[in-house]
Each structure stands twice: as C-alpha cells, then as structure tokens.
C-alpha cells in the first residue's frame, strides 16, 4: 500500500480570511439566539460563510461550513459544561469533551449544507433554491435523528417578533427558518455583485421575491394578531419554588420543600380564585403514590384552595416482574382526588435514560447515576372540569409534534412543567422559553409554564409572553388565559411545509451528485 497517498486535509489550501469569515458567521448566528438574542443578526449571519465558500471546491466548503457550525453551536450550547460539571459532578475536562462531541455532531449539518450547495452551484442549481431547502430539510432531520435534538432551530431567533411568528400556525417554526435562510442568500448576492463590480449587481428578482414573501408573512401576522381570542377565560396560578438542585432530592429537605410550595400556593390563591394551580417538574421530590404523609398534605391543599392542581412528581408502575419509573405530573381535583396523570414521553438521553444501554452495557458504567426512567405510553388530555389540558414535562416543549398531539387529543391549554435549575444563570432557560412560544402559536392555544428556578411564564395563543418571572427567585405568577380552540392549519396537517422542504432538499442533493454537463465543466 502506498502510504504517501494518505494525507491529512490541506487546511492551508483555504485562506485564513475565509476561515475567519466562517467563524464570523458562527458568532453572528450564536448572538442571534437568546441570550443576548440579537434577532436581526440571524438575517445576515450566513452571508460571510457564503462569501467564503464562493467558487470553492465542495470539500473546502464542507470544512468552512463545519467551522461555522463549531463556532455557532459552541456559542449557543456552552451551558452544557455547566450541567455536566456543576450538577453532574464530573471533571471540567469531561464536560468540555461532552460539549465538543455534541457541537461536532451538530456542526456536520451546516457542513453538509455548504458542501451540497457548492456541488449544486457547479451543476447550475441556484443558491436561492438550494440553500433554504437544504437548511430547513436538514434542520427538520436533526429534530428526529439520534433521539432528536431540535434545539436552536433558526426560526426560534425571532420568538419576540410577533408579526413574523404568526406564520408558524401554517408552517411551524420551519417557515421562518426558510425565510431567514432565503434572506441570507439575497444579501450574499447583493454583496457579491458589488464586490465583483458587475454592471448590474443588484439581484432584482431575488430581492422582489424576498420582499413579497416578507410582506405576505407580516401582513398575515398582523391579521392574526387582530383576531380576538374567543375561548373561555381560565385563571392560572404558577408556582416557582426555587429549590436548590443540590438539596432537591435530599430526603431531609422534603418537609421544607413541601412547606415552601404550600406557602407560595396560598400566597398565589390569596390574590384571587384560580382554576388551576401549577407546580414545576418534580416539585414533589418523592413518589407521590407512595408517600402518604406529604401526598395527603398536598391533596388537602387543593381542597383548601378549592382549585385543580398540577403537581410534578416521579411515579412508578408494574410492568410484569419489574417496576417502571416515570417522570410524571399528577392532576388533583378541587376535592383533593387524583383525577389524572401525565407521564413524560420524550426522555432526556443521558439524563433520564442511557440510549442503547442493552447493546452497549459498558456505557452504564461510564455514566453511573443516570436516571433509569421509562417513557410514558400515551398522550392524554386531562380534564379539569373547566377545560382539558396537555402537560409537557421538561424539554418536551421543544418538540412540536408532542404539543400538536396533545391539542389534537382535546387539550385547550398546554402546561409546561420544568426544572431548569441544571442550566444555572446561563442562556439555556431563555433559549428554552423561546421554543415554547412557538408551541402556542402553532396550535393556537395558550401555554403556561412553571419552572423550579424560572423562567415561569404565561404565553397567549399569539405567542405574546404576558408575564414571566426572574431566574433563581421564589415567585408566583397569576394570570388569565383564553382557552384555545386548537384550530390551525399546522395542528390539522402537521409539518407539511417541513416535509416539502425535505423532499426539495432530496431533489437538490440528487441533482448535486449527477455528472456535470459539458456546459458547466
């Protein structure tokens, strides 16, 4: 074998300026997500990368796209190191390793987009078509591949721009991702035209197409924002206990934990009657079914306050000879009876279970202490007597298909209970809430959110955050929402737009691998 032919990639073949441009794209993309959440940057973030990739070999474009992905996702997901080091009690070098592996995996997506875009350009496929289709197609694929990780989809950068995000009730978040990707291509064409000093550098047709799509999107948004919410009024009281993660599961602290939630619940309901009291994920740090002393106190509290209550607590049930452990929420009636339970369906990999544990038994030894939870078996809309609710536990709120399923099952209010204490005072809680805003708009139902350490919030069916609490403070949040009708194109037909982009991306990829025509050689 001729080992002289085995060479490392020639990174020097790409000018340093182009690498800096790729890094700049990643930095701009990271800054567009919360926090700091400078959302306009998303509309220009890819222009430096596209300029760097111009007329380059597709393999070099792949490297540049990978560099952009590394810079972007390292900036967005840096908080992974906080979770692993501070709460996982693992050495910092392990946390950096975990972050590096995740970021490297995610960076493959923009790398593949850059590669296919350049191959497509060499075969006459317009960037105006290929880039938005490939970006959205792969972004949608990322939501399902390798357990699914739809965190930081491009459209989420615009969660506070209400006129823009109303289109999500038709296209989901992916419609905005498509529009942002398209805008970046148009900007790139304008810059390239002026830089090349072409006689007619202004891409008139591209600009007109973009402006028409933007105007239609914004006009639709303003129209939807002026449609009054017609559902029945429903009062909620949300409790933020601010229980320190380091003592949360300490049995000696259970009494104080329950007392904190009792005190805050009475404070919330003293401000006025409530139809639903909501405690966060695992607010009751014990098995609600198997701890009569504290469970009876919580049931008594619901009777005292004359309200339905959602209480986050682990649960268990028999599955043949073994016990299944579940991350659950119990619904209590105003009479203190348990009238429903919702179990978490989409578990956190390496947080609540170990993927492929049976095939890779050695992994369990490497991650000792990881929870051994089982996923819930069914989507259940729980009836409060005044309206049905769908409960999303923890990061289930980032999966559009779960919220859609709960609403299709009859839920008229989505309730997200979570414990974001793991994230510390990082960007992660803000990124988390930005995604739940879209679940309300997509399904045209309000969403209320109770988080152990924040951000607790009330979001109406238009995506307007009507109230939110600060991080790491005890807090109560009272408010009134209008129960949704759950009638939207997205709720009825799902990710039709995203699937159309997947199909378009597949066609682009197929054409990109065809033999070059003589005209383009």
Swiss-Prot record:
InterPro entries: Apolipo_AcylTrfase (IPR004563), C-N_Hydrolase (IPR003010), C-N_Hydrolase_sf (IPR036526), LNT_N (IPR045378). The active site is at 281 (proton acceptor), 344, 394 (nucleophile). The lineage of its organism: Bacteria, Pseudomonadati, Thermodesulfobacteriota, Desulfuromonadia, Geobacterales. The keyword Ribonucleoprotein does not apply. The chain crosses the membrane at residues 27-47, 64-84, 93-113, 125-145, 167-187, 202-222, 493-513. It comes from Geobacter metallireducens (strain ATCC 53774 / DSM 7210 / GS-15). One of its GO terms (molecular function) is N-acyltransferase activity. Its EC number is 2.3.1.269. Residues 239-483 form the CN hydrolase domain. GO terms for biological process: lipoprotein biosynthetic process. This is Apolipoprotein N-acyltransferase. It is a multi-pass membrane protein. HAMAP family: Lnt (MF_01148). Pathway: Protein modification; lipoprotein biosynthesis (N-acyl transfer). It is found in: Cell inner membrane. Its main location: membrane. It is an enzyme of class 2 (transferase). GO terms for cellular component: plasma membrane. Belongs to the CN hydrolase family. Apolipoprotein N-acyltransferase subfamily. PROSITE patterns: CN_HYDROLASE. Catalyzes the phospholipid dependent N-acylation of the N-terminal cysteine of apolipoprotein, the last step in lipoprotein maturation. Keywords: Acyltransferase, Cell inner membrane, Cell membrane, Membrane, Transferase, Transmembrane, Transmembrane helix.
């Amino acid at each position: 074998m001729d080992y002289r032919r085995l060479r490392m990639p020639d990174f020097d073949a790409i000018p340093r300026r182009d690498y800096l441009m790729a890094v700049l794209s990643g930095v701009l993309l990271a800054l567009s997500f919360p926090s700091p959440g400078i959302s306009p940057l998303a509309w220009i973030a890819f222009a430096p990368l596209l300029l760097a990739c111009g007329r380059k070999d597709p393999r070099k474009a792949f490297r540049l796209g990978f560099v952009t992905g590394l810079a972007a996702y390292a900036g967005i997901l840096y908080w992974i190191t906080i979770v692993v080091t501070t709460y996982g009690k693992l050495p910092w070098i392990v946390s950096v390793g975990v972050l590096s592996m995740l970021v490297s995996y995610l960076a493959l997506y923009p790398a593949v987009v850059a590669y296919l875009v350049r191959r497509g350009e060499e075969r006459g496929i317009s960037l105006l078509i290929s880039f938005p289709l490939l970006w959205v197609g792969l972004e949608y694929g990322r939501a399902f591949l390798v357990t699914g990780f739809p965190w930081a989809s491009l459209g989420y950068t615009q969660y506070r721009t209400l006129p823009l995000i109303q289109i999500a009730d038709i296209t989901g978040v992916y419609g905005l991702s498509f529009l942002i990707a398209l805008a970046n291509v148009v900007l790139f064409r304008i810059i390239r035209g002026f830089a090349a000093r072409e006689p007619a550098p202004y891409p008139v047709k591209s600009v007109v197409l973009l402006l028409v799509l933007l105007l239609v999107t914004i006009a639709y948004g303003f129209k939807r924002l002026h449609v009054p919410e017609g559902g029945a009024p429903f009062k909620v009281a949300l409790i933020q206990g601010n229980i320190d993660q380091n003592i949360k599961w300490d049995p000696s602290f259970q009494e104080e934990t329950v007392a904190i939630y009792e005190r805050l619940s009475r404070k919330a309901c003293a401000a006025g009657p409530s139809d639903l009291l909501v405690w966060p994920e695992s607010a009751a740090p014990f098995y609600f079914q198997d701890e009569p002393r504290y469970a009876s106190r919580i049931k008594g509290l619901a009777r005292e306050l004359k309200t339905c209550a959602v209480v986050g607590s682990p649960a268990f049930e028999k599955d043949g000879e073994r016990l299944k452990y579940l991350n659950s929420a119990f619904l209590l009636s105003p009479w203190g009876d348990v009238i429903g339970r919702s179990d978490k369906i989409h578990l956190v990999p390496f947080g609540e279970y170990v993927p492929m544990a049976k095939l890779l038994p050695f992994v369990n030894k490497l991650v000792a202490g990881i929870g051994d939870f089982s996923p819930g078996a069914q989507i259940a809309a729980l009836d409060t007597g005044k309206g049905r609710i769908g409960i999303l536990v923890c990061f289930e709120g980032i999966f559009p298909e779960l919220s859609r399923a709960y609403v299709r099952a009859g839920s008229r209010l989505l309730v997200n209970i979570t414990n974001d204490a793991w994230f510390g005072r990082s960007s992660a809680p803000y990124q988390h809430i930005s995604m739940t805003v879209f679940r309300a708009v997509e399904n045209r139902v309000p969403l209320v959110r109770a988080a152990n350490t924040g951000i607790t919030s009330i979001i109406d069916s238009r995506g307007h955050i009507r109230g939110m609490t600060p991080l790491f403070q005890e807090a109560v949040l009272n408010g009134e929402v209008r129960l949704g009708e759950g009638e939207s194109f997205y709720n009825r037909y799902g990710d039709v737009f995203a699937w159309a982009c997947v199909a378009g991306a597949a066609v682009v990829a197929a054409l990109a691998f065809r033999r070059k025509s003589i005209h383009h050689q």
